[in-house]
């Protein structure tokens, strides 16, 4: 389906409310998406965002901009979540290699090849540090979405 020549009409049964306002048709494209993302991704607080001015600049109604902003943030959160998953999977595979290496070292210690013992407290400290780093990265998607919704007051 081509977006340039496709129109969708929806007919809803019943009367329109008295205060119903027909929205003006507008065109939305990837260029406007990029402009919206650059503006909303840099705001520090909700007071910094003037939705009416932004709507006038982009030629779109305010409710659409808020919904689109939410969608853009949601997409960015998915990308971030995927990056965190990839990072944690990479770390867990490297940790499994380290555990194999530790087992080999312990076997070597038990044999007569090595005359000294490996300090196990160093290994425990390293494992605890890496697991605490992973726990700092794990933020639930719903918590990030809730924070976003609070920020945008949607």
UniProtKB/Swiss-Prot annotation:
InterPro entries linked: ATG29, Atg29_N, ATG29_sf
- Can you quote a single GO CC term? phagophore assembly site
Which keywords describe this protein according to UniProt? Answer: Autophagy, Protein transport, Transport
Query: Pfam families, from UniProt?
Result: ATG29_N
Q: Where in the cell is it found?
A: Preautophagosomal structure
* BP GO annotations: autophagosome assembly; protein transport
Q: What is its main location?
A: other
Q: Does the keyword Protein transport apply?
A: yes
Function field: Plays a role in autophagy. Functions at the preautophagosomal structure (PAS) in order to form normal autophagosomes under starvation conditions. Also plays a role in mitophagy and regulation of filamentous growth.
Q: Which family does it belong to?
A: Belongs to the ATG29 family.
The name this protein goes by in its record: Autophagy-related protein 29
Q: Which organism is it from?
A: Kluyveromyces lactis (strain ATCC 8585 / CBS 2359 / DSM 70799 / NBRC 1267 / NRRL Y-1140 / WM37)
